[in-house]
Amino acid sequence: MKKIEVVAAIIHDDEGRIFATQRGYGDYKDGWEFPGGKMEPGETPEEALKREIWEELETKIVVERLVQTVEYDYPQLANGRACSRSEDSKHTLVSSHLTAAFHLKMHCFLCSIESGSLVLKEHEAAKWLSKDQLDSVDWLPADKVVVEKLK
């Protein structure tokens, strides 16, 4: 099974809102996620996250702390998205009862904006969401695990 390791930014503002982005490409187009991307060889998760957010949003961030590492087996899209999960303190393993297309390991960090204006270069939409609004968008499965922890 293909394994992908990524980083994701849970960007918050002074009002406690969280920045969510809508994917503009790929198999999971239109799903909502925390912005971020794949780590390159030799990068720390924090370095990768700063690079990805600059590339995707033209924004410099401060990486504050690791919130959670999620491991998720994404099923073949034709089979749907049924899954079960088990949790411990900082790791969540979500395993599908279906054939997995790939295994995702996503390191999610709480971040704030240092400078920049959040220009959407790869996403089709974005929203600032209060905690009460977190369920108002259709989160991708791995991101949904993190959303539950943030509530």
Spans of features found by a protein language model:
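Conserved Nudix-box catalytic region and its N-terminal flanking loop in Nudix hydrolases
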Residues: 17-55, 59
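Residue-level preference for beta-strand/loop junctions
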Residues: 3, 28, 103-105
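Intrinsically disordered, low-complexity segments enriched in serine/threonine/proline/glycine
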Residues: 85-90
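Intrinsically disordered, low-complexity, charged terminal extensions of DNA damage-control enzymes
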Residues: 58-60, 64-67, 103, 123, ...
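Hydrophobic packing within well-folded, soluble alpha/beta domains
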Residues: 11, 45-53, 66, 126
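Conserved N-terminal beta-strand and adjoining loop/helix that marks the start
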Residues: 1-18, 38
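Active-site-adjacent beta-strand/loop module that shapes the phosphate/pyrophosphate-binding cleft
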Residues: 13, 60, 71-80, 84, ...
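NUDIX/MutT-family hydrolases
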Residues: 110, 118-150
